Amino acid sequence: QASSSAASDVYKRQPEGLIIQYGGQTPLKLASALESLNIPILGTSPDQIDLSEDRERFLNFVKKNNLTQPPNGMASNEKQALKVANMIGYPLVVRPSYVLGGRAMEIVYDDKDLVKYLNTAFKVNDSNPVLLDRFLDIAIEFDVEAISDGDKIVICGILQHIEQAGVHSGDSACSIPPYDISKTVIKKIKVEVNKVISNMKIVGLVNVQLAYVNDQVYLLEVNPRASRTIPFVSKALGVPLARIAAKVMAGKSLKELNFKGVPDIKRFCVKEAVMPFNKFQNVDPILGPEMRSTGEVMGIGNTFAEAFEKAEVAAGVEIPKTGCAFISVRDTDKQFLSEIITSLNQEGFKLIATKGTAGVIKDMGFKVKQIKKVLEGRPNIIDLMKNKEVNLVINTTEGRESIKDSASIRRTALDQKICCTTTIQGAKAICEVLSKKVDWSYQKLQEI
């Protein structure tokens, strides 16, 4: 168990110091307590760790160093929160400080949502202020893993999330290398990451989360520790990143370790989250900013499509190659439907959709059968799913009421083992698999 008393017991054995970067979020919260016991912390200092965890301190750091974040503001009571929300506009992501796995983070869409959040999900006060920032709805999110010795920085991996921003990084599938982003964007990401790490005086491992939209890279979070994707990146690269970082924290420089960088990846590696929803009845399997996954799997392939399909199969999801696809998407996603509908039509899928989405599909010139929503009578989409007449579900939604109204669709898909995605980027990835018609390649683990 990670606790200050347990760490103190370990220190009685007279080590040179303690490394707290390998226990996730929990040991980071012990940094100040350990420092007060005069226990040396190897690697990034407790003060810099606190800088990354304290939303208000980090916001000031961002402003001081001319870094770019989404429009945001701090609030320690309901009145302040509503004022900030009115200033930057909805939808917003509400982020408390010092939380594990995105706990109590939420996307809110109006004043009513915000007030309910502040009075139920998280008790905001002077000791527990929250950061409210503009939700970058259609942004592409990235995780960047790096090692720094306080002087030299090596970026070890840039992972592109498949689900768009707003889904917790632990729940989103991700690809290394990035699968559809330009070298120009990669360069912008590297510049931003190097700037953050050098100014924060990071020593050891660090995870930086960013988003890209409208030709702008935004800094979301910095985690001065080994993230949950370090084992995945190490496996993809064939490089023991944890071992190298431990030596750096123990005092070695990257130059002394002759660690100049990581090799180019000649294949695609996709990490997919494993969800526990089938163990919990009546839980809506929709993804959001609060982490819900309990594990992860890895797919490796010569193309992104191959790696993604392997990862889905490993996570227990079979992507149907033909059949009937049900589509119901929020208004902001309808602009992206053309590519998806074209792909499904070319693969011979029959299309069914609720009224609003069906109208958009018809306007594109495709055949589609309109189906009733659950509250509009029967037969409705739930009936078709239970009758095994649906093979693929694409369901995106926003707003508390809309999410609640469509929860039964996602739950039925899970119970009936129907392939279901709740993001438009997830739907695009599925269509990539369908259009490529990939024959799987196989390699010995020793050759990877």
Regions found by a protein language model. Give the residues of each.
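Single conserved hydrophobic/aromatic residue that forms the stacking wall/gate
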Residues: 1-11
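A conserved helix-loop-beta module that forms one wall/lid of the active-site cleft
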Residues: 44-105, 364-371, 425-432, 437-438
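Internal nucleotide-binding/catalytic subdomain
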Residues: 88-293
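Active-site charged/polar residues at nucleotide-handling catalytic sites that mediate phosphoryl
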Residues: 12-13, 88, 388
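Acidic, glycine-enriched active-site microenvironments
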Residues: 8, 40, 205, 226-231, ...
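Gly-rich Lys/Arg/Thr-decorated short loops/hinges at beta-loop-alpha junctions or inter-strand turns
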Residues: 37-44, 57-69, 96-102, 166-180, ...
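A short, GP-enriched loop/loop-strand-helix hinge that lies immediately N-terminal to
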Residues: 13-53, 68-74, 344, 415-424
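Short, ordered loop/turn segments at secondary-structure junctions
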Residues: 23, 44-49, 77, 97, ...
